[in-house]
């Protein structure tokens, strides 16, 4: 932002995860200037996501420490490296954990939103040149998911950032960097739900509720939210669900699959798993209509978990598929989703149930694990 910082290291506050299963520590970190095809962003707000907690817990096989977590952030471009043409200093931006280079086999296929260009280095917590831009107390600090939004400044690859309408406030825009877009896109892009479809959504967190939004926008006939917490019924109704089922309160001998097949005259056209529970994933598939029902897996299961069903479920016409970031291409499609929010077509602010300053980010993690939190937003300013 200021010419006095361009090309120079910046010292700022960040929440550093020094080791697994320990609280984050607020530290002074040094953020190096961006190199070729890199962008340095002054971040204003970040969401706290279950993926961050999963890595912090130590069970993530790709987790490495020390690291600056966070992948749901929005801010302003402070400076750019040589060769950057897609954003400029002063642009309002969202960091992208799913990049879009437009040149790799994945991007050119037109069949996926996945991009292979920097996957190898991103998974190791470093920039494309194999090094980090963060240091603290003389130690190199790793990046996370190509974003590291738990810092007042971050450096990302130019293919991992997108300029958005500056009318979108950062505390809302940041949530479109993961949770809301993941669910909304799964309904509108991956599944491509159509008017009159019957759908069931397993899991009433921010992703599941955003699936409901997308299905409602498309004119689905029945949108059934399935959750073991009765508190989620009201949330579902707010976003467009037409029914709610708590599988723990069904009559003895009645399974959730039985119930959904009964409610939808033979099964759902689409089901969505937003839980990461492999048992739920099986139920979601088997609640699909014979001949054409499709189940979309969105929730990320714990390491080592496997899905199973009887092959006959697939032979008789059901489809199992998955979605990352809702099938949304970050650089080419996310700005349009931001505009949908600004036009009042997509609810975002309603999902913010808790707010904390950076100094209290550990409290935001505690709130996330509580039943009444949909999304906690951390103010980085």
Swiss-Prot record:
Catalytic activity of the protein: a primary alcohol + NAD(+) = an aldehyde + NADH + H(+); a secondary alcohol + NAD(+) = a ketone + NADH + H(+); S-(hydroxymethyl)glutathione + NADP(+) = S-formylglutathione + NADPH + H(+); S-(hydroxymethyl)glutathione + NAD(+) = S-formylglutathione + NADH + H(+)
PROSITE patterns noted in UniProt: ADH_ZINC (PS00059)
Gene it is expressed from: FDH1
Function text: Oxidizes long-chain alcohols and, in the presence of glutathione, is able to oxidize formaldehyde. Also acts as a S-nitroso-glutathione reductase by catalyzing the NADH-dependent reduction of S-nitrosoglutathione, thereby regulating protein S-nitrosylation.
Family, similarity comment: Belongs to the zinc-containing alcohol dehydrogenase family. Class-III subfamily.
Annotated GO MF terms: alcohol dehydrogenase (NAD+) activity; S-(hydroxymethyl)glutathione dehydrogenase (NAD+) activity; S-(hydroxymethyl)glutathione dehydrogenase (NADP+) activity; S-nitrosoglutathione reductase (NADH) activity; zinc ion binding
The record's free-text note on cofactor binding: Binds 2 Zn(2+) ions per subunit.
InterPro entries named among the record's database cross-references: ADH-like_C, ADH-like_N, ADH_3, ADH_Zn_CS, GroES-like_sf, NAD(P)-bd_dom_sf
Protein name according to UniProt: S-(hydroxymethyl)glutathione dehydrogenase
EC code: 1.1.1.284, 1.1.1.1, 1.1.1.-
Lineage, top ranks: Eukaryota, Fungi, Dikarya, Ascomycota, Saccharomycotina
